[in-house]
Amino acid sequence: TDNEEFRVAAVKDRVDTTMQVWMGLTMGCAKCHSHKYDPISQSDYYSFYAFFNQTEDADRGDDSPTLFTPTEVQARSFDAAGRTVKLLEARHKASPESGDERVKVSKTRLENVRKTIANTPIMRDLAANKQRTTKIHNRGNFLDPDDAVEAAVPELFGPLPEGAPRNRAGVADWLLQPQNPLTARVTVNRIWARLFGIGIVETEEDFGTQGLPPSHPELLDWLAVDFREHEWSLKQLIRSIVLSSTYQQAALITPEKQAADPRNRLLSRSPRVRLSAETVRDQALSLANLLTQKVGGASVMPPQPAGVWKSTYSGLKWENATGPDRYRRSLYTYLKRTSPHPALLTFDAGSGEVCQIRRIRTNTPLQALVTLNEVSFVEAAGALANRAGKFRGSDHADSLKPLFQMVLIRPPKFPELARLVALYETMQQEFPEGSEAQRMLVQASGSKTSDAAMIAVANVLLNLDETLTKP
């Protein structure tokens, strides 16, 4: 591979991502020619590119350079282990008795603590005497350089703050300065979209002339100013939104509201949208008490169908995780960009090739097949059935009531309970005691119970619209 080609592609991706994430601008359109719709020239693009063009980059297999980034708890453990090693070494030097073994054990303990702490990949600037000259790329081709440019932000948005360094730290200051209203607006809009299902500006990724106008411009501006005045606190922003009377409305829709506000752009009711891909899986595991609570660590490989994931060059294989790693949060799922996890992809998760600002939510039959048949959901149903079995009584309803409440966090209404009982009795006929069908379902679910009918009912409850939808 051409090392410089990949380095340039990575730098351009950082430029595009920075401007789209923080400014809501499709600046990547200006890498080959001046932007067709927004007032951003090709010179603006490469002047901004110059800020990111001075970092140590190479097409290496490792993540260097990295920064040692322990959590507060990890830092205390690491410091305590380090102090123990220093103390034992000092005592060893001052004592005629041998203490080599104790020092060795303590150093091993220190190294084990170090291994649990993340090393975060960072960008480190080149030394002053090694700085690169940035040139405009004709038609975006790095092999066809044109005029040299100096590092600068797009003219449309004003210069760097007075006294700010002409590097990436200066860009950060520029993004957050009060004279730049876009950063706060774009961030507030993104949080609003996560809570309401759609942003005040629907096109989260494009605040330019081709993006859609805000449905409530004054509200967007007020939230942006309030966000900045509260020192960019996301916690405060989320609290102010979810405690509002607008958010706390009922999600019920009437014919009048449907006619006047079909997409809820006027906020006539509370949002009701399907959970994200990762949350759909994590919720099922959490309801079944299977979700592993561990924070941080290496990526894991939860179950997926055989043959989906193959690596031609490295020989790496998808090894279905076992034990606690099997049920880690979906955030930790190993991501191969050419072959994302199929269950997550079916629910609109991104492939990881580029930064995805907004997921377009789809509704397909394939999604129901995932929640009914995918291994994680079947095993979650098995664990739920096992929990429900603890409430078993003389009547099927004795187990079905708590099972329903475990999943939907409310007691079932009488017609709902009647349908559940009828479903359970039907499933008993589908999976009779001692049958091969019963054995296969119980085995697939990993459940301790042999009640295949209860597993099937739990599976149906996990697949309900009410379960998969944010109320």
Regions found by a protein language model. Name each.
Residues 457:
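Short, surface-exposed polybasic-aromatic patches that bind anionic ligands, especially phosphate groups
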